[in-house]
Amino acid sequence: AWMNCEIISSSGKEGNAVLLNGFLLFDCGISWKRLKPYANRIRLVFLTHIHGDHFNIKTIRKLNQTRPLLRFVCAANLITPLVTQARVPLDKILLVRPEDEPGKTHDFLTGTDITMSSFHLLHDVPNVGWIVNVSGGEEPGTAMYATDTHHIPIAAPGLDLYMIEAN
């Protein structure tokens, strides 16, 4: 299969973290102890929203200390807590604007055949969903990650992998 999805944790009590293809981390709501075995493989972290089961400040801080070149992708509302609480340098944060630029394609992993886009999700706080596209290789395909939402855009049919978390 072209996509390998490892669910590190997906429960409200233990937090949420999903590793796609062994190096794309979606959400970081788990303890450092749970994430540490995967930390050196992660190349990019996608954050959805501020709730603690998706955004564990202590774990993000430790991940940033352990992997100082690692970058975090998020919407504008998460920049302040990333910088002030998790102590992630501003230059390590990649900003997406799902409400202003829905579907805009980003090439955050330069030199690869992987692109991604974000979309707005309905929740009680600002929330972002992600679409990752692998255009090259033997098995190209597209995956979506959405969490804690009341609906998924109808514009998301025809994907190869749907990762939907809700608890």
PLM features: residue spans?
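Metallo-beta-lactamase
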Residues: 74-140
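Conserved beta-strand hairpin/beta-sheet module of binuclear metal-dependent hydrolase folds
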Residues: 1-40, 128-148, 161
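Active-site environment of divalent metal-dependent phosphoester hydrolases
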Residues: 14, 33, 51-55, 79-81, ...
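Short loop/helix-cap segments at secondary-structure boundaries that form the rim of catalytic
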Residues: 19, 35-40, 81-87, 153-158
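Active-site metal-binding motif and surrounding structural segment of the metallo-beta-lactamase
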Residues: 31-78
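Short, well-ordered alpha-helix to beta-strand connector turns
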Residues: 22, 42, 67, 90, ...
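Cap/insert and terminal regions of metallo-dependent hydrolase folds
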Residues: 156-167
